[in-house]
């Protein structure tokens, strides 16, 4: 047995038992004390490098904080908060239509910042008062391109507070691949240039909130990390809590000090299209309809269906959202809801010309830099709105249509100094999109007939 032990050697460095002080045996392998010391040195070096990187990141963050920053805007007071009618008037300058939604938003935003002014830093609220004012987050329901994000952004600009947009489809429950809900607060903090106090008075718009609905009303057996799991993770943030926000993102930089943000003063606005929610409401109201629509009336019926859907959504109840896939706890933290109308052709025409930053005005400004005066005939504006309405993507389709229309013009005009004026006609719009847009199915049926 002693003769057999004399041939033992380290499985890593190959040294025999006589050449080392200690040889530790494992299942089929051996390691000497020298290799163990070497492994410990490697681990210590990696730990030191990781801590040094973390200290460097903290130093960069502290240098950014030490850099001169814009002075924080003063907290709102009851005298400086715009009244609901003033808020709606400002929204009218930027957003066409949606009067009911504007009214709901104006009152909700006014009450929210009036609550912040009432609480203040603790000195504004009377000590004898036992009344605590809780915030009311907002839910916007409307089809794509109807102005949900623009409304929230315009509100933030008017109130002069930081504004951040988050996409609910990228969020996952903590511990899974995707973004943590704390990253939403990190974006708001970045918009506030690292000013925590200013960020705590900001507005966060969470888009595509309907995409985190669970697949069925009944609790799932398997874990839904991007649906119900995200709703559960958002509960405390929506209600109000002190969240720990990693300034460099929590997953790639574990060695960093977190910044604490109180979300009780942040206004959350959630928006989504909620496709199929009108069917849920109609089933509750017992208004199901089954039938076939002739091809020649399909376009008119489609427009009528959009209008009917918006009217049905006005009968929305919390139980309908539960059946759609939102958990009751989540719905309870968004008590204010507003339904946005789908945009018709008249609204799209107004969007092209009326707002302060209307698309027609934007392209006129672009060409004026080349000393060219651009004009849109009313018939051309109507044709652009008609094409955008046919695409069913709301106001977002308008820019794509005009970009296609203006491509050759913006390519040639800078090199043609003799051109001083250009007029967009209806014929030019039809010619531009006649070969690029598929005809409506009803027209195909008429041609085949």
UniProtKB/Swiss-Prot annotation:
Pfam families: AAA_2, ClpB_D2-small, zf-C4_ClpX. Keywords: ATP-binding, Chaperone, Metal-binding, Nucleotide-binding, Zinc. Zn(2+) binds at residues 10, 13, 32, 35. Residues 1-51 form the ClpX-type ZB domain. It comes from Synechococcus sp. (strain RCC307). Gene3D superfamilies: 1.10.8.60, ClpX chaperone, C4-type zinc finger domain, P-loop containing nucleotide triphosphate hydrolases. One of its GO terms (cellular component) is HslUV protease complex. ATP-dependent specificity component of the Clp protease. It directs the protease to specific substrates. Can perform chaperone functions in the absence of ClpP. The gene is clpX. Signal peptide: none annotated. One of its GO terms (molecular function) is zinc ion binding. One of its GO terms (biological process) is cell division. This is ATP-dependent Clp protease ATP-binding subunit ClpX. It comes from the Bacteria. Residues 53-79 are annotated as: Disordered. Component of the ClpX-ClpP complex. Forms a hexameric ring that, in the presence of ATP, binds to fourteen ClpP subunits assembled into a disk-like structure with a central cavity, resembling the structure of eukaryotic proteasomes. Belongs to the ClpX chaperone family. InterPro entries: AAA+_ATPase (IPR003593), ATP-dep_Clp_protease_ClpX (IPR050052), ATPase_AAA_core (IPR003959), Clp_ATPase_C (IPR019489), Clp_protease_ATP-bd_su_ClpX (IPR004487), ClpX_bact (IPR046425), P-loop_NTPase (IPR027417), Znf_CppX_C4 (IPR010603). ATP binds at residues 143-150.
């Amino acid at each position: 047995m002693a003769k057999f032990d004399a041939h033992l050697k380290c499985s890593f460095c190959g040294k025999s038992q006589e050449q080392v002080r200690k040889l530790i045996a494992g299942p089929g392998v051996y390691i000497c004390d020298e290799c163990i010391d070497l492994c410990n040195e490697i681990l210590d070096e990696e730990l030191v490098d990781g801590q040094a990187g973390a200290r460097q990141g903290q130093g960069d963050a502290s240098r950014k904080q030490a850099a001169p920053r814009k002075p924080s805007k003063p907290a709102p007071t009851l005298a400086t908060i715009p009244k609901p009618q003033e808020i709606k008037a400002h929204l009218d300058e930027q957003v066409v239509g949606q009067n009911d939604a504007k009214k709901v938003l104006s009152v909700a935003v006014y009450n929210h910042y009036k609550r912040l002014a009432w609480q203040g830093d603790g000195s504004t609220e009377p000590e004898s008062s036992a009344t605590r004012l809780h915030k009311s987050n907002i839910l916007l329901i409307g089809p794509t391109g109807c102005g949900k994000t623009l409304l929230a952004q315009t509100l933030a600009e008017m109130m002069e507070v930081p504004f951040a947009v988050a996409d609910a489809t990228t969020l996952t429950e903590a511990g899974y691949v995707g973004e943590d809900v704390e990253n939403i607060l990190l974006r708001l903090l970045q918009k506030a240039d690292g000013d925590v106090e200013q960020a705590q008075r900001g507005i966060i718009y969470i888009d595509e909130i309907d995409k985190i609905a669970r697949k069925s009303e009944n609790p799932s057996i398997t874990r839904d990390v991007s649906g119900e799991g995200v709703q559960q993770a958002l509960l405390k943030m929506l209600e109000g809590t002190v969240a720990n926000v990693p300034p460099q993102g929590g997953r790639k930089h574990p060695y960093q000090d977190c910044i604490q943000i109180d979300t009780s003063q942040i206004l959350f606005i959630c928006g989504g299209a909620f496709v199929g929610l009108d069917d849920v409401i109609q089933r509750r109201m017992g208004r199901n309809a089954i039938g076939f629509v002739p091809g020649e009336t399909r376009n008119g019926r489609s427009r009528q269906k959009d209008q009917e859907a918006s009217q049905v959504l006005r009968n929305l109840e919390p139980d309908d959202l539960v059946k759609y896939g939102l958990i009751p706890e989540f719905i309870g933290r968004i008590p204010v809801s507003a339904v946005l109308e789908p945009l018709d052709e008249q609204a799209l025409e107004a969007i092209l010309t009326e707002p302060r930053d209307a698309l027609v005005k934007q392209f006129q400004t672009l060409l004026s830099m080349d000393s060219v005066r651009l004009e849109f005939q009313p018939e051309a504006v109507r044709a652009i709105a008609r094409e955008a309405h046919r695409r069913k993507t709301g106001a977002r389709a308008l820019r794509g249509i005009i970009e296609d229309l203006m491509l050759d013009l913006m390519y040639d005009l800078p090199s043609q100094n003799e051109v001083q004026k250009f007029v967009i006609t209806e014929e030019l719009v039809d010619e531009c999109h006649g070969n690029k847009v598929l005809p409506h199915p009803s027209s195909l049926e008429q041609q085949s007939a």
